[in-house]
Structure formats: structure tokens, C-alpha cells
Amino acid sequence: MAIYAVVGTQWGDEGKGKIIDFLSSKIDYVVRFNGGNNAGHTIVVNDKKFIFNLLPSGVLQGAKCILGPSVVIDPLILIQELEVLKNNNIKTEIFISDKAHIIMPYHIKFDELSEQKKGIHKIGTTKKGIGPCYADKINRIGIRTIDLLNTEIFANKLKTNLEEKNQIIEKIYNDKPLDYDDILNTYKKYIEILKSLITNTEKILHHAINSEKYILIEGAQGTMLDIEHGTFPFVTSSNTLITAAAGCGIPISKIKQKIGIIKAFSSRVGSGPFVTEISNSIGDIIREKGQEYGSTTKRPRRIGWLDLLTIKKAIALNELNHLALTKLDILNNIESLKICIAYEFQGKIYDYIPTSCETIEKVKPIYKVFKGFKEDISNIKNYDDLPIEAREYIEFIEKEVGIQISILSVGSEREKTIFRNQEWSNI
């Protein structure tokens, strides 16, 4: 038995999808433990691109897929993704936790109206209803998948919630109320499609652990978007750390292989402090070469140099023991590369990320500058064949964070991967 966990070390979009995809080849179960359809992951197989927002990345390898209790589910999006599997003749088993919460139309409406009302102070959400759904969960009025299995219970909860939500929509936001019958009838159709997938996933996972199955736990977004430890309030609405996987019913002590994914540069979507942001043409070049546009929103991502303070924080919080570096190939033909090693503000040097966003906005990055490499590295298979400049960049990261980078991604396709030890190449 082995239980692997994969998390992002930055603001999401690190390339977790590709790494998870090939790790899943010998995995029995892939478990998604947080987030909703605000998190997009892209996988390229045989030159065909797949983009999923809810289904785990490992679904393409035939592993059994579990959407855990802390995932919030938009039924329409999930049904559309199941259709993609069907249309591409991808066969797998999907299990939805009966404790997972359901995104309702009023959640999406609230997300849109709230962002509009904030104006220039908006968070930059995906407007998918994620935050309002988690808010209802914490407020103990959310609708769970188990409620969908009893039409009377679902209808009553919807009626109670919608009466309150429509009051707010009309009186606070001066907008049109949502129609109860329309929502009920639409969701009844969703229920017919999804009801056979809803089950006690905790029981399934306990049986898998006792049967010594291989399990891969997949996190959405990244450490710096964690609701507790990220750049609050410019964060997501769930816990993105490996510790949140306990919500699936898997004891943290069972997770021995903890893999952090680092993109060779930084990016973030939406508002919030971004110390290493590149505000010149180099940022534009990296964005276009790396196709750094949100797979969910299509919004252009903000681009920055690699920030080691975020990586060190992610390693400490997640207790990572393995690292994978992605998109190194995107950095070729750039004259100088930079890595942020500390912050400075009013003569004070920070070797950690301040808690206050107001402080983070004011700090200046302290950089280590590296000579760039010109070669196209996308077809290189062995580490020693990389340009010396690329190896110096990688080895500096390793020296600073104290963990070897075991996996290097030099292209979006599965085969464009360099393994630095036998353990990973045999998976």
C-alpha cells in the first residue's frame, strides 16, 4: 500500500494535472479533497487536451475517482465532464461523497452580485458560487448530496433557503429573485443522472486502505490560496493543504509520500499581492509561451519570478518530502532569470511572508539573478543533458529549500518528463 498526496506550492496552476496524470498509472483510487469547479486542470494525452474542473486529474488513467466531502459540486458541470468521459470512451468508476455540498443557482448569483458591489475592491473570484456555497456549509444551511436522494427533503431545504436568499437578492442587491419551481425541476433532472454515484466514500477509502490499495490524494489550487495560510482575503474558500485531506476520511499519518508541485516561475489569477510580479514585456512573453490563461475563466494570469518564500512556506506547512518542477521549458531564450530569496521593507529583511496583505503590497523582492539558457529543452530525457544554466537554476532551488526536485516537466505531454531517481520513473 502507498498513499500519495499532491499539492500546489504557489497560487495554483502549477501543472499538477500532468504530474497527477502519470502518477495515476498504477493508482487504484484518486481522491479530490477540496474546492469546486473554480479549479481547472489540463492534461494532454496523445496530442488531445482534456480540461476538467471537478473530476480528478487521474480519471484518464482508469483509476477509481472519489469526490470527497469537502468538495463543492455544481451538478451541471459534473454532468458535462462525465459526458466528456463517455464521448471519449474513457471508462472509470466515479464516487461522490454523500457529505459533499451542492452549489445552487443562488450561490452563483450571490458570487456575481457580491463582486459587482465590491467594485475596485473585488477579490477576483471565478463567480462560480464556490465561496457562497462554503459559507452556507459553515452556516449549517447548505444542501448536501445526501439530501438529493430524498426529493421531499431537498425540496423543503431549497424552499427555506431560497426564501431567505431572494430577500437578500431583492432588498440588498436590487436584483430579480430566483424561481423556486425552475430550480427544483432543473435539479430533479440532475439528480436522476447523479444519484447512482452518491455514496459513503469514507467507507470505500477505509476498505481501500485496509486492502492495501494505492491511493493518490489530489489538491486543488495551491498553498498560497489556502483560506487560513494564504494571502487573505485574496484566497480561495477552502483549505488547500495536505492536512485537509483528513476530511476525506484518510488519516494524515497514513500519507507517506507528499509531493509539492512548483512552477518554474510564479503566476496568480485575480486580485491580491504578488511581490515578484513582472510588469514588462518579459511577463507577456512568458504568459504567451506558457499559455498562462485560466483553464476555467480564460483570464490572463499575472506572471512573476519564482518566489522561494512561498515554496519554503508550502514545504513547511505540508511537510513535503518530494518536489516536481514544471514549465522549465518556457524559460528558454530569456537573457536573465530571477529567483526571489527574501523581501525588504524600510530596511527590514523578511525571510518569511508577512501576514498582512497591506505589508506584502509594500515589500520589495530581493533577487538572485541567473544567466538564462537558449536551448529548446522540451525533448531532453536526461537531467545531465540539460544546459548548465538550467541545472544551476534547479540546483539553487534545491539548495535553498533542502529537497531534491525528483521530477522535471519540460512540456505538456506525458513523455516530456525527466526523472531524477528510479522510484518515480517506475510508477
Curated annotation (Swiss-Prot):
Chief location: cytoplasm
Keyword presence, Cell cycle: no
EC number: 6.3.4.4
Pfam families listed in its UniProt record: Adenylsucc_synt
GO BP annotations, alphabetical order: 'de novo' AMP biosynthetic process; IMP metabolic process
Entries under InterPro entries matching the protein: Adenylosuccin_syn_GTP-bd (IPR018220), Adenylosuccin_syn_Lys_AS (IPR033128), Adenylosuccinate_synth_dom1 (IPR042109), Adenylosuccinate_synth_dom2 (IPR042110), Adenylosuccinate_synth_dom3 (IPR042111), Adenylosuccinate_synthetase (IPR001114), P-loop_NTPase (IPR027417)
Function: Plays an important role in the de novo pathway of purine nucleotide biosynthesis. Catalyzes the first committed step in the biosynthesis of AMP from IMP.
Subunit composition and interactions: Homodimer.
Protein name in UniProt: Adenylosuccinate synthetase
Source species of the chain: Borrelia recurrentis (strain A1)
